Swiss-Prot record:
Oligomeric and partner information: Interacts with PRKAR1A and PRKAR2A. Interacts with ENO4. Interacts with QRICH2.
Protein name (record): A-kinase anchor protein 4
One of the protein's GO biological processes: flagellated sperm motility
Propeptide: 1-188
Functional note: Major structural component of sperm fibrous sheath. Plays a role in sperm motility.
Composition skew (Polar residues), residue ranges: 183-205
């Protein structure tokens, strides 16, 4: 017999994360010498992985029979358990089949995804281990076959059918089966009203309030479509001889593809029905097509199901449409119009009644439909856009004329506005350097002179090299009286610096226009007899010097800002201003450290707390310095990775690390070395292409590395924060969860041994994850020994070792589930970053348990 009923899901009350149940033993099934033991056999079947041929040929009778066993419309939150209620005396093994649909992995909420699958396996174990009569709630009525009424007070009659079931590999046996359909939701369901009105309503689950427990739009559409199908089925059923005959159908495992199943009675009857319906329809249509609806004649039509469950279409297809299309088109349109109007009215009524008095707005339904369709095409859309963009940019960048034109326009624009850019940059730098004044300290800023000029009349463009500016902080008398802020005036150093900057900018503008002005700088006077370096005739040197000068000036400003905090470090030894030692160490190592290691070193220096008087100030200063340290390390990394000449880098380092006198002598010492480079003149076009391409490639590579590092560590930080948030949320309810666990009426006595056969896994990871979740569910129900059958590829051979290790270390069900959550979280993080996980689940558990 087959009985549909709603059950109260005992597994919904389980606090899986805090369950203290011990794990059971696990082993691989071996049929030798184990035939006479009392055990249960559970076969988990994922209906989404069944072959279409098996569904059409073998399962057609079951899906279209009076019992409404349609596996194609099985939802993700619904399971079907088929049990052997007539246990044979000579066999102590009782079999069950659990039909469900595997839900896809959810990268947003790993916990809900794992608990959803775990609930399905727990429901399968619950119904398989429970007594046969406990899963029915009302009484079984008389059957029209050879079976009689079962004397039980807690069963009810829905519809009975004899099933020919192929049980494992022991040959077909006539078994009396019981089917229990339950919803995997968080609300307990206690059916009180048997749905016995029509066979099409067998799968609906009623609640005491009279409302449907599902609030999904697809359920109502499927239910409405079943009513339309029932109308056509009733007309076809009238043509059968003996409409109350018992139907037979067969169920076979998906692995028996080579076997030819015997044609069942339902298949024969269905073929006869279709043949007779076609003949009757053809004869009636030859007579008069418009009288078909009034005369209660039948049309054979097929159902087109939308697999996304967003809606279903009914398309009526007459077999002889080519010959009689003109005569029956009007009748078909009238019939389709009536069916469509009835469906719309029924949909509105159903939504109004079964949605707690609040109909679902049309915009919400449209949003669901759009989201489901958008998720399927967004990946292809992104791939096509990136491919087209790559093709376009690849063709343009290989075109030398296009590249040269872009670079020419870019550098012409930069050449015209170079003076304004340099002036604004230097003014901002001077204001930043002279903005923060100490009352107890005076600033003596010594600026190195600006060297400019040329001895080569062929050079049209003149370069301007700014040497690094060094600030010397000299302490004055601390007892000096405070000056009036209103009477403050510019110091001599400020006036000299402003005068030098103005003169240098004026001189540089004159040289750019071709006016050879006289150099008034002392260093230029002393170096008249020396041969000056030759400037590259290409315009890209101006842009390169501009970028290098900007980076060096920003680097110098950050270094001097950190240097100015040294006296504060001496007063507060535990503060976090120890960056200068790190910067010096960075320069000694040649800039080999990355920004990550530099920032980690800076965090380590903050370990020792300082005195209580300056703790708050130190924390604020440390937050400001962290950002400047990261920017400084990034600039140093860009300068070290960019293809500049060694002479320019060493010259800038000497200017940065020495006093003003040594900085003046440094360019003079480099004159003989630069004379060797003056002899080699590069062509304008070739030099621009080579240098610009190499420079741009290096900059792009450095920026991409930085973006990858930032994306990787930001994702990990967000993931760790999410894990901590989930752990805190779960920990808040741990006490009430444990109290609820103590009040549950689970059987403490060990139950029978269970053999599990899985026919739903497609990948190795999914197969191992499914086996571990089934192990957790079996442990919760006190299964002493769990056997796994059908491990032909050897993916579960390490599972007994994992179970032995977990039992040895005292792991519980909740501890094991938390370890599985960690593995799933780490794997999704690796996939998001682009790293594929090498270890499988069982290998990871062996290494981390």
């Amino acid at each position: 017999m087959i009985a549909y009923c709603g059950t109260t899901t005992m597994s919904d009350d389980i606090d899986w994360l805090h369950s203290r149940r011990g794990v059971c033993k696990v082993d691989l099934y071996s049929p030798k010498g184990q035939q006479d033991q009392d055990r249960k056999v559970i076969c988990f079947v994922d209906v989404s992985t069944l072959n279409v041929e098996d569904k059409d040929s073998k399962g057609a009778a079951g899906s279209r029979s009076e019992g409404e066993l349609n596996l194609e419309t099985l939802e993700e939150k619904e399971i079907i358990v088929i049990k052997d209620t007539e246990k044979q005396d000579q066999s102590k093994t009782e079999g069950s089949v659990c039909l469900f649909k595997q839900a896809p992995s959810d990268p947003i909420s790993v916990l809900n995804w794992l608990l959803n699958d775990l609930q399905k396996y727990a429901l399968g174990f619950q119904h398989a281990l429970s007594p046969s009569a406990s899963s029915c709630k009302h009484k079984v009525g008389d059957l029209e076959g050879d079976y009689s009424k079962i004397p039980s007070e807690n069963c009810y009659s829905v519809y009975a059918d004899q099933v020919n079931f192929d049980y494992l590999n022991k040959g077909p046996q006539n078994l009396r089966l019981e089917m229990a359909a339950s919803k995997n939701t968080n609300n307990n369901q206690s059916p009180s009203n048997p749905a016995t009105k029509s066979p099409s309503n067998q799968r609906s689950v009623a609640t005491p309030e009279g409302e449907c427990s599902m609030d999904d739009l697809s359920f109502y559409v499927n239910r409405l479509s079943s009513l339309v199908i029932q109308m056509a089925r009733k007309e076809i059923k009238d043509k059968l001889e003996g409409g109350s005959k018992c139907l037979h159908h067969s169920m076979y495992t998906s692995g028996d593809k080579g076997k030819t199943s015997p044609r069942s009675a339902v298949s024969k009857i269905a073929s006869e029905m279709a043949h007779e319906a076609v003949e009757l329809t053809s004869s009636e249509m030859r007579g008069n097509g418009e009288d078909c609806r009034d005369g209660r004649k039948t049309f054979l039509y097929s159902e087109m199901c939308n697999k996304n469950k967003c809606g279903e279409k009914q398309q009526m297809c007459p077999k002889d449409s080519k010959e009689f299309a003109d005569s029956i088109s009007k009748g078909l349109m009238v019939y389709a119009n009536q069916v469509a109007s009835d469906m719309m009215v029924s949909v509105m009524k159903t939504l109004k009644v079964h949605s707690c008095g609040k109909p679902i707005p049309a915009c919400v339904v449209l949003k669901r439909v759009l989201l489901k369709h958008t998720k399927e095409i967004v990946s292809d859309l992104i791939d096509s856009c990136m491919k087209n963009l790559h093709n376009i940019t690849g063709v343009l960048m290989t075109d030398s004329d296009f590249v040269s034109a872009v670079k020419r326009n870019l550098f012409n624009h930069g050449k015209q506005n170079a003076a304004d850019i340099m002036e604004a940059m230097l003014k901002r730098l001077v204001s930043a350097l002279l903005g923060e004044k100490k009352e107890t300290k005076s600033q003596s800023l010594a600026y190195a002179t600006l060297k400019a000029g040329t001895n080569d009349p062929k050079c049209k463009n003149q370069s301007l090299e700014f040497s690094a500016m060094k600030a010397e902080m000299k302490g004055k008398d601390k007892c000096k009286s405070k000056a009036d802020p209103c009477c403050k005036s510019l110091t001599s150093a400020e006036r000299v610096s402003e005068h030098i900057l103005k003169e240098s900018l004026t001189m540089w503008n004159n040289q750019k226009q071709g006016n050879q002005g006289k150099v008034t700088n002392k260093v230029c006077c002393t170096s008249k007899d020396e041969k000056r370096e030759k400037i590259s005739p290409s315009t890209d040197s101006l842009a390169k010097d501009l970028i290098v000068s900007a980076l060096m000036l920003i680097q110098y400003h950050l270094t001097q800002q950190a240097k100015g905090k040294d006296p504060c470090e001496e007063e507060c030894p535990g503060s976090s201003m120890g960056y200068m030692s790190q910067s010096a160490q960075y320069e000694k190592c040649g800039g080999g450290q990355s920004s990550k290691s530099l920032s980690m070193k800076h965090f380590e220096t903050r370990g020792a707390p300082g005195p209580s008087t300056c703790m708050k100030e130190n924390q604020l200063e440390s937050q400001k310095m962290d950002m400047s340290n990261m920017v400084l390390s990034l600039i140093q990394k860009l300068l070290s990775e960019s293809p500049f000449s060694c002479d320019e880098l060493t010259e800038s380092d000497n200017k940065r690390c020495c006093d003003p006198r040594s900085s003046k002598a440094a360019p003079m010492a480099k004159r003989p070395e630069e004379q060797c480079q003056d002899n080699a003149e590069l062509d304008f076009i070739s030099g621009m292409k080579q240098m610009n391409r190499q420079f741009i490639d290096q900059l792009v590579e450095s920026v991409m590395k930085l973006c990858l590092i930032m994306a990787k560590y930001s994702n990990n930080g967000a993931a760790l924060a999410e894990l901590e948030e989930q752990a805190a949320l779960v920990g808040s309810g741990s006490r009430c969860g444990r109290d609820a666990m103590m009040s549950q009426n689970y059987s403490e006595t060990p139950g029978p041994e269970v053999i599990v056969n899985n026919q739903c896994s497609t990948t190795n990871l999914q197969k191992q994850l499914q086996a571990v979740l089934q192990w957790i569910a079996a442990s919760q129900f006190n299964v002493p020994m769990l056997y796994f059958m059908g491990d032909d590829d050897g993916q579960l051979e390490k599972l007994p070792e994992v179970s032995a290790k977990a039992a040895e270390k005292g792991y519980s069900v909740g501890d094991l589930l938390q370890e599985v959550m960690k593995f799933a979280k780490e794997r999704q993080l690796d996939e998001a970053v682009g790293n594929m996980a090498r270890k499988q689940l069982l290998d990871w558990l062996l290494a981390n348990l």
